[in-house]
């Protein structure tokens, strides 16, 4: 696919699953800018260091399939198979990913194999995770393929203290990971992920050049593009989908701040909005801190939303010497 935006690519996937002719299975491949995709049943606040994502301009979205959170960048190639429901058994990832493994074996990664519920491994290290979704007698299975991903980012993203947030969402399970590039034959260790993608496609289809399978390329109409853009706007780029779909959870943060004292914040968040707030501590204030707690109730629990709302008040009136900026950091640290 043309886009490097995961939100557009997921919108395209969903649209094609629902509307494309799948008399022949569809195979989609795409490469995207740095992003994190959480599973359908996950809580972004619990899974991720959202401050790190925001500061490093890493896109966040939610997919419609289950599973855990994944990080993609331009060193990753994602792929999707869309088939009739009766052509694939839900959860049979080994069957779905077999063509990918066969192609990788031809390219030199002979130790690559399926393992666990839905992963691909090489020498005991994970390089691909997969998930499935079924609807209207169709199933799509999509997955990542870590070719040359910046692995140093992974631990920075998937780090949130369990003491800070408690919810009933599905947690991600960290696994030791690797990139597949170093396991390929030297002639296939390309500098660009796009070149790896093209070679993998050639191996999958048994051709020497992509021009030989040009007729298999799916062309989108203007109506298709408009429908996909609508999905992008209303779903994958919409905070209500990304955050509002999160299961109810509690946020707890207790810290000591110089010249302020101890500040202990407890929030309940339901459907992405603060439903209850309590602030405790040994700090001083000119106004009852309960007014600050009440001010938070009903607000969207998003950094940008709370930052905008706090422009209406001065936190230091309720918690002496605490700036709006420091209070904001306390709510999202």
PLM feature segments, named:
Residues 131-132, 145, 255, 263-281:
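Short beta-strand elements
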Residues 223-270:
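Structured beta-strand/loop patches that form or line metal/cofactor-binding pockets in enzymes
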């Amino acid at each position: 696919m043309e886009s490097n935006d995961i939100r557009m690519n997921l919108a395209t996937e969903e649209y094609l699953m629902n509307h494309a002719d799948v008399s022949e299975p569809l195979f989609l491949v795409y490469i995207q800018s740095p992003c994190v995709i959480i599973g359908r049943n996950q809580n972004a606040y619990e899974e991720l260091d959202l401050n790190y994502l925001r500061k490093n301009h890493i896109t966040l979205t939610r997919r419609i399939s289950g599973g855990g959170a994944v990080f993609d960048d331009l060193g990753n190639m994602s792929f999707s198979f869309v088939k009739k429901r009766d052509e694939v058994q839900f959860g049979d990832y080994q069957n779905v990913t077999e063509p990918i493994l066969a192609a990788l074996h031809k390219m030199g990664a002979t130790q690559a194999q399926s393992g666990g519920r839905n992963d691909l491994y090489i020498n005991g290290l994970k390089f691909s995770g997969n998930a499935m979704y079924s609807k209207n007698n169709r199933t799509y299975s999509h997955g990542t393929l870590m070719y040359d991903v910046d692995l140093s980012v992974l631990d920075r993203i998937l780090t949130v203290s369990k003491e800070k947030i408690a919810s009933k969402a599905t947690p991600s399970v960290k696994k030791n990971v690797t990139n597949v590039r170093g396991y390929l034959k030297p002639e296939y260790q390309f500098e660009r992920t796009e070149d790896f993608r093209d070679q993998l496609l050639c191996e999958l289809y048994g051709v020497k050049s992509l021009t030989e399978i040009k007729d298999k390329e799916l062309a989108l109409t203007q109506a298709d593009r408009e429908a996909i853009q609508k999905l992008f706007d209303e779903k994958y780029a919409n905070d209500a989908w990304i955050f509002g779909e999160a299961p109810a959870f509690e946020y707890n943060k207790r810290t000591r701040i110089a010249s302020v004292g101890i500040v202990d914040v407890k929030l309940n968040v339901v459907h992405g909005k603060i439903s209850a707030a309590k602030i405790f501590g040994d700090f001083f204030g000119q106004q009852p801190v309960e007014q600050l707690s009440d001010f938070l109730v009903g607000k969207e629990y998003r950094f940008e939303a709370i930052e905008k709302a706090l422009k209406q008040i001065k936190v230091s009136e309720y918690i002496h010497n605490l700036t709006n900026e420091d209070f904001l950091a306390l709510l999202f640290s």
